[in-house]
Design a protein with these regions (language model features):
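Basic- and aromatic-lined ligand-binding clefts that recognize polyanionic substrates
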Residues: 50-54, 58-62, 164-225
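Structured C-terminal subdomain patch of bacterial secreted/periplasmic proteins
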Residues: 250-317
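Sec/Tat signal peptide C-region and signal peptidase I cleavage site
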Residues: 23-29
Length: 317
């Protein structure tokens, strides 16, 4: 994140102060609630109507409980929100990426609530919180059930926790259904699985402690990550051709996020090293959408992932 020049910072600070005074005098006297965030407790009054999300998980949570955010960030490696949300997000304003938000675009939307990721810098938080209550997740990436905790956090901020609890209960029923299918379709000793994302430089292995891989574990797969991921990192460095054997599990879920990745994967699929993999010979490499499988999180993304797993199991030889 680039530093904000002092002149721009002061101009934004003045604008934000004026806006904060406006919102402070126009809020209705309604029930308030306090949520714990990365930067301390934040109090929210009423049911927000002008929500801006700066994190894909927050956008997913918003739609899962029926909220309609005005702004969102572009998905990783794309030019819009993730494909699985685009039908719901028609007309939404794009306010940057998860790495670099457009502060002026956010301010222009006059939000009454801003939802952000754990990675939001404190300087930006200070600016945004002058516009509207800003909820930055304090949940660590590798915490147990991190995505569920975040979903409940954002739903609480939206005043719709009861709807999120209902959505999670329905999802748990779906998880149980897919788990039963895994147990029916695959022998107990043939359930090892790995999630990789193919990049132009080669495949990266994703940690077994992330949103998607935790879902795979919940439905009965023995998820591995090849012991090639450094502590605190979500994925490995790109693997060389000589190390492709690390991908050779009973099931390989292979994600791509753009055309460059797809082209690189297509070239690799013709290589002897790739064709020697037993998982390839067994036809149990499952191509998946990297925007969902390696970037998204939340109830709606989980539904897409479970559908993909179900289709793969039913299509397996």
């Amino acid at each position: 994140m680039q530093a904000i020049p002092v002149s721009i910072f002061m101009r934004l600070l003045f604008s934000l102060t004026v806006l904060s005074l406006f919102f402070a005098t126009s809020v209705k006297a309604e029930d308030s609630r306090t949520v714990e965030t990365k930067f301390g407790p934040v109090t929210i009054t009423g049911e927000p109507q002008r929500v801006v999300t700066l994190y894909e998980g927050a956008l997913d949570a918003s739609y899962a409980v029926g909220a309609k955010p005005l702004g969102a960030v572009i998905t990783r490696g794309g030019d819009n929100v993730a494909g699985y949300l685009q039908d719901k997000a028609k007309g939404i304003a794009l306010v940057g990426t998860s790495q670099e938000n457009n502060l002026e675009a956010i301010i222009a939307l006059q939000p009454d609530l801003i939802l952000a990721a754990n990675t939001l810098p404190e300087q930006q938080y200070r600016l945004l919180s002058r516009v509207a209550p800003t909820v930055a997740s304090g949940v660590g990436m590798f915490e147990e059930e991190a995505w569920r905790k975040e979903a409940k956090l954002f739903a609480t901020a939206l005043g719709k926790l009861h709807l999120m609890e209902e959505a999670l209960a329905e999802l748990d029923e779906r998880i149980a259904q897919v788990k039963a299918l895994v147990e029916t379709k695959t022998p107990e000793d043939q359930r090892t699985a790995l999630l990789a994302r193919w990049m132009p430089q080669g495949p990266v292995v994703l940690s077994k402690h992330l949103f998607t891989t935790s879902l795979l574990s919940e439905v009965g797969f023995a998820v591995e990550d090849g012991d090639v991921i450094k502590s605190g990192r979500p994925h490995s460095s790109p693997l060389s051709q000589e190390k492709l054997s690390l991908l050779d599990k009973d099931w390989l879920f292979m994600a791509t996020i753009n055309q460059d990745g797809k082209d690189a994967l297509a070239a690799a699929e013709r290589s002897p090293a790739y064709q020697r993999l037993q998982v390839v010979k067994n036809q149990q490499v499952v191509p998946v959408d990297g925007h969902v499988w390696s970037s998204a999180s939340g109830v709606l993304a989980a539904g897409v992932i479970l559908d993909d797993v179900e289709k793969a199991l039913n299509a397996a030889p």
